[in-house]
């Protein structure tokens, strides 16, 4: 039961950090390549 409580307290923190980093990455990509339907990396 203690492991379940530890998991339930760690998972929201990790998911918040992950989604925050993902949102920041998407914002930076949209800043450098605005309105890109395909990425001009090729």
UniProtKB/Swiss-Prot annotation:
GO annotation, biological process: photosynthesis
Domain of life: Eukaryota
Membrane topology classification: Single-pass membrane protein
Compartment annotation: Plastid, Chloroplast thylakoid membrane
Record keywords, A-Z: Chloroplast, Membrane, Photosynthesis, Photosystem I, Plastid, Thylakoid, Transmembrane, Transmembrane helix
Pfam families (UniProt xref): PSI_PsaJ
Transmembrane segments: 7-27
Keyword Chloroplast: yes
GO CC terms of this entry: chloroplast thylakoid membrane; photosystem I
HAMAP family: PSI_PsaJ
Family: Belongs to the PsaJ family.
Function field: May help in the organization of the PsaE and PsaF subunits.
Protein name per the record: Photosystem I reaction center subunit IX
Gene this protein is translated from: psaJ
